[in-house]
Amino acid sequence: MEKIEGDFSTFWRFDILPPINRLSWWWWWVLVLVPDPNHPERSRQLMVLWSSKETPAIRVSGHWWIPKSRMLVDEDGGTVMSGMVCAWWYDGESMFEPLLMKECRMAALDDNHPLWPEEATEKGQGAGAVIPLTSEDLSFGLRPGRKSFWLNLSSDENQVAKGAPKNFSVTMNPWWERPSTAKYKNNVFGLNMGYDIQRVHGMKATLNLDGEEIEGSAYIQKVGVQAPSIPWFWGMLHFDDGSYLDWFMPHVSPSFTMKDDTPWSVRDFFRSPNAGSGLFHDASRNRTENFKRCTVELERQEGEGSLRDEQGNLLPRFKVKVWNGRTQISIHVRATSRARWVFDQPTRAGFVSHLTYNEYPLEVEKIAILDEQGLRSVDDYEWIRGNAEHAWGILN
């Protein structure tokens, strides 16, 4: 596969829907997964987020962000916006969070913009970049001809002093057709509320870590959401043969009333699923399975060998099942660490809405993939690496 396929005509733009105060939220999100030589069953992971929001003010993990201006779009589709670049790094033992949390203005443009380098060839194919206007290189972009993505990041000095790497540089090349072709979803519910999402499910990644090069994989998404954020489960797995699996289960739960980041609340005892789904790019069968049925069970790790997060809380185990008329997949995965982002946004009459967004590097304990050709298990793969999300509260 010589280039990344798909429609990237709006990948570098967020003016798809008119902004809604306190509800519009935009971001690019990249997750890089590389092997952990000390714990082969785990993976080291880097997450980077470039984000902006239509809001008078919001507190992000204790830091108040007050936008200095609204998003501006020029006549050529270039965007300048206030926002933040946020990141975490998990080295297989310790979670460095936030690895970076930096306020800045960001410029985003595509290869049709007059400011795109003149020497770049193959214009109009969706190449582009988001460029934070900072002294450090914190850029993320797609090279001309859609040959590869790049990402550059410099860690906060306080995290470097604690043992985090200083500089990260990632090149992401296409893997194979199904996971490395951008998938687009857009849905408008009414009153301009809805979502606009584009994903590249699987890429080969080369991570340069303070001069050391490591081969792994990457997941990329660009999201615009214009609706209240409700509790959800989401997760994904990359397999050594290039297969990709994900699951998503938004749910109605008393956990939407939670106001802090403490897990295992008694309010999180009941979850009513709301349109769960899943997707499996199956490399060995050379096909894609879509699932409209999904269940997610959450339980604490207990007993010898159970793991805890940096705050001492027991980490979860997820039991996930997705199925359709041909294929059924059941997995048991446990979190090996936890990164959390805590959002508090003033609303009306002095009320404050809250969302805790947790990200968990995963270790796969069991997997069963059953279809018309037989049963596959974890033993059929050299490695499986992944990440899961669990969010509670409601942000509006």
Residue ranges of predicted features:
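Structured soluble/peripheral alpha/beta segments that form catalytic or ligand/cofactor-binding pockets
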Residues: M1-N396
